[in-house]
Swiss-Prot record:
PANTHER family hit by this protein: CELL DIVISION PROTEIN WHIA-RELATED
GO BP of this protein: cell division; regulation of sporulation
Protein name per UniProt: Probable cell division protein WhiA
Keywords, in A-Z order: Cell cycle, Cell division, DNA-binding
Phylogenetic placement of the source organism: Bacteria, Bacillati, Bacillota, Bacilli, Bacillales
InterPro entries reported for this sequence: Homing_endonucl, Sporu_reg_WhiA_N_dom, Sporulation_regulator_WhiA, Sporulation_regulator_WhiA_C, WhiA_LAGLIDADG_dom
Entries under SUPFAM superfamilies matching the protein: Homing endonucleases
Length: 323
């Protein structure tokens, strides 16, 4: 995907999507509501839509020219602070009020509407387009290779943030949630499956494929790691038990001698000393007089552990109760 971030590549893909006439308003309304500002110059109402992404600026310019009879300029400024990126400004210099009214952003008397107008998102395709515009304007998504999955859309206004969340949940069941931030509000997704669904909803199919590819590999790697960790833990437990058993058997041998043990315990004790690395199942296959189950071998080894502990404590041992 080159040096661009996953979020940048996703947005680049979205700016190439063809928009149906009925969806143009929805996408443009989101882009302008979230990235636009108005000002007055020579008694004219100007609309400035600002972005640091050249492809998004071209997208806004194209949608405006395609859908409206307005006078539009495209300006480029250089940021002087921190990252000296270009800032692109799409400026509407004529027909601003009519445009904002048609996009349900401004009412009569220059009053702004922050919630999403139901009129703009009546069709499913228009709902998708509004969400696409919102993601282009204020969205970000973590690279799927990072430690946590996260997608969010930032909005300055609570009312817009809540209506955005409602649109995502009511129409597409995305389990989106909202959160207040220092300078505004976010609608966000944390579940990998829901992020994948959102990418599909807004038409980012190449990004979705990459996201799913990385997610499958990552989940597989996590499963393998969990399996290895589990196997390692079990192995460590088995080794620890075997070492304890050998130590106890040697203590019995040094204290009273293995010959004092009942025959069945004596045989297991000698086998465990001779074959310290084998499993209980393998020990069970080595005994004379037929195969013994793992639980049977484990029972005898526990009895040997008990005898060793009683010897250490100086307690009497009744070998008749040892089996």
């Amino acid at each position: 995907m080159g040096s661009l971030s996953f979020a940048s590549e996703t947005k680049k893909e979205l700016t190439g999507i063809e928009v149906k006439p009925c969806c143009l308003k929805a996408e443009l309304s989101a882009l302008i509501r979230m990235n636009g500002s108005i000002s007055f110059s020579n008694r004219r109402l100007l609309l400035n839509i600002q972005t640091e992404n050249a492809a998004i600026a071209r997208r806004i310019y194209t949608l405006l020219k395609k859908g409206y009879d307005v006078v539009v300029e495209l300006l480029v400024r250089k940021k002087m602070r921190l990252k000296k990126n270009n800032v692109y400004i799409v400026r509407v210099v004529e027909g601003t009020h009519e445009l904002l009214s048609d996009l349900k952003i401004m009412e009569e008397g220059f009053s702004f509407v922050h919630a999403i107008s139901p009129e703009l998102v009546q069709k499913k395709c228009c709902k998708r387009s509004y969400l696409r515009g919102a993601f282009l304007a204020g969205g970000s998504v973590n690279n799927p290779e990072t430690s946590s999955y996260h997608l969010e859309i930032f909005s300055l206004y609570r009312e817009h943030n809540e209506s955005l969340c409602e649109l995502m949940n009511t129409s597409f069941h995305l389990h989106a949630r909202t959160l207040e931030r220092k300078k505004g509000f976010i609608t966000y997704l944390k579940e990998a499956e829901k992020i994948a669904e959102f990418l599909s909803v807004i038409g980012a199919h190449q990004a979705l494929l990459r996201f799913e590819d990385v997610r499958i590999v990552r989940d597989m790697r996590n499963s393998v790691n969990r399996l290895v960790n589990c196997e390692t833990a079990n192995l460590n437990k088995t080794i620890g038990a075997a070492l304890r058993q050998v130590e106890n058997i040697r203590y019995i041998d040094e204290t009273i001698g293995l010959d004092q043990l009942p025959e069945k315990l004596r045989e297991i004790a000698k086998l465990r000393i001779a074959y310290q690395d084998v499993t209980l199942k393998e020990l069970g296959e080595m005994v004379s007089g037929g195969k013994i189950s793992k639980s049977g071998i484990n029972h005898r080894l526990r009895k040997l552990d008990e005898i060793a502990e009683r010897l250490r404590a100086g307690q009497p041992i009744d070998f008749h109760k040892s089996l």
